[in-house]
Swiss-Prot record:
Cofactor entry: Zn(2+)
HAMAP family assigned: Hydantoinase
One Gene Ontology CC term in the entry: cytoplasm
Biochemical pathway: Nitrogen metabolism; (S)-allantoin degradation; allantoate from (S)-allantoin: step 1/1
Name of the protein: Allantoinase
Role, per record: Catalyzes the conversion of allantoin (5-ureidohydantoin) to allantoic acid by hydrolytic cleavage of the five-member hydantoin ring.
Cofactor binding summary note: Binds 2 Zn(2+) ions per subunit.
Organism expressing this protein natively: Escherichia coli O1:K1 / APEC
């Protein structure tokens, strides 16, 4: 049999092992894995490289339509491809209107036409004003629903995202349980965080350490504990977003051990940045939950290696530079990190701390694909989409602003020495990024809908 592509001699991350083996691709799918696979139109030599499943980033904000001056599909998905991401799951907020019904998600589809370098699945929003319309988004094909129990959204904009109170969360979770959809939650106690933040501003406490102190660990833990119980009573599967503390992870682990259907994610910035670095970097490193101290970071690494965190995500949430101006308490909270997930975590987790390659593959791709039902993604296995990223180990470079593909070329990772490089990203058998050629093909990304899986 003749194939379209054979990748030879790479160390391939399979589900339970990593070994030097060849991969054959036909019609955008993985056709065979082994040795001496035969002929192909194209042969790639991956000697000395790690061949990983393309990253499935389960937490991305693109902001188009309505706020494409923050980030757009063209720039955002190019950055993703350059960073080794082949599939993103897009959040329902930052864009205007927020993705809360059939009409708003159709605007997303229209805005993305001809611009997707990678594939994309969508999340719907669970907000205070759409509980009777959740079925519309389920029918369209979203793979989950995001909500905030922390304060969010611009109250001066009618169609912006909104947080939910406990009653709205419970009613929404009941409906989503009936639909068989997971609910994803940003967990911080809204009343306490808001009050602590206002108190700090009144008293002129506006440093990074002050910001972190205004969103203490207990506000995350309390919110996780609360939504765990409400989701359990409502009969809804729960996914806890961007957990920032080991104590927060422990709540998820405890519930899981008791039989609850719950998963959680975290982000590279909670593992490689700490509060002192946040103070030095400034507003570019502001996010919520916040980047905490070094002791907290050590605890997060322990939880990650223990297998208590299901997947790593970017939570890419950029904004125009002027929204990052001023003191930390006033600046927009969100990190531009889409392009730096795979290489930073390969360096920090695999090269510096000895994480196994199969575990790395699960955290970056496989588990997210499983959690959100992306059946063709996340694995290097026959029949799956031929989505790969080539990683060059022990190849250090310093990230510069010019390296970035974002709408705004800023990131808290600029200036960082990263000890591994993404050299090639392949989507359904086609090279979409190459370190020498750039982006050699026109955007070929597609939307992934739940009912098409």
């Amino acid at each position: 049999m003749s194939f379209d592509l054979i990748i030879k001699n790479g160390t391939v991350i399979l589900e339970n092992e990593a070994r030097v083996v060849d991969i054959a691709v036909k019609d955008g799918k993985i056709a065979a894995i082994g040795q001496d696979l035969g002929d192909a139109k194209d042969v790639m030599d991956a000697s000395g490289l790690v061949v990983s499943p393309g990253m499935v980033d389960a937490h991305t904000h693109i902001s188009e339509p309505g706020r494409s001056h923050w980030e757009g599909y063209e720039t955002g998905t190019r950055a993703a491809a350059k960073g080794g991401i082949t599939t993103m799951i897009e959040m329902p907020l930052n864009q205007l209107p927020a993705t809360v019904d059939r009409a708003s998600i159709e605007l997303k589809f229209d805005a993305a036409k001809g611009k997707l370098t990678i594939d994309a699945a969508q999340l719907g929003g669970l907000v205070s004003y759409n509980i009777d319309r959740l079925h519309e988004l389920d029918e369209v094909g979203v793979v989950g629903f995001k909500c905030f129990v922390a304060t969010c959204g611009d109250r001066g904009i009618d169609n912006d995202f909104r947080d939910v109170n406990d009653w709205q969360f419970f009613k929404g979770a009941q409906k989503l349980g009936e639909l068989g959809q997971p609910v994803l939650v940003h967990c911080e106690n809204a009343l306490i965080c808001d009050a602590l933040g206002e108190e700090a501003k009144r008293e002129g406490r506006v440093t990074a350490h002050d910001y972190v102190a205004s969103r203490p660990v207990f506000t995350e833990v309390e919110a996780i504990r609360r939504v765990l119980y409400l989701a359990k009573v409502a009969g809804c599967r729960l996914h806890v977003c961007h957990v920032s503390s080991p104590e927060g992870v422990e709540e998820v682990t405890r519930a899981r051990q008791e039989g609850q259907d719950v998963t959680c994610e975290s982000c590279p910035h909670y593992f490689v940045l700490d509060t002192d670095q946040f103070e030095e970097i400034g507003t570019l490193a502001k996010c919520s939950p916040p980047i905490r101290d070094l002791e907290n970071q050590k605890g997060m690494w322990e939880k990650l290696f223990n297998g208590e965190i299901d997947c790593l995500v970017s939570d890419h949430s950029p904004c125009p530079p002027e929204m990052k101006a001023g003191n930390i308490m006033k600046a927009w909270g969100g990190i531009a990190g889409l392009q730096s997930c795979m290489d930073v975590m390969f360096d920090e987790a695999v090269q510096k701390r000895g994480m196994s390659l199969p575990m790395f593959g699960k955290l970056m791709a496989t588990n997210a694909a499983d959690i959100f039902g992306l059946q063709q993604k996340g694995r290097i296995a026959p029949g799956k989409d031929a989505d790969f990223v080539f990683i060059q180990p022990n190849s250090s470079y310093v990230l510069t602003n010019d390296d970035l593909e974002y709408r705004h070329k800023v990131s808290p990772y600029v200036g960082r020495t990263i000890g591994a490089r993404i050299t090639k990203t392949i989507l359904r058998g086609d090279v979409i990024y190459d370190i020498e050629q750039g982006f050699p093909v026109a955007p070929k990304g597609q939307f992934i809908l739940k009912h098409q899986q």
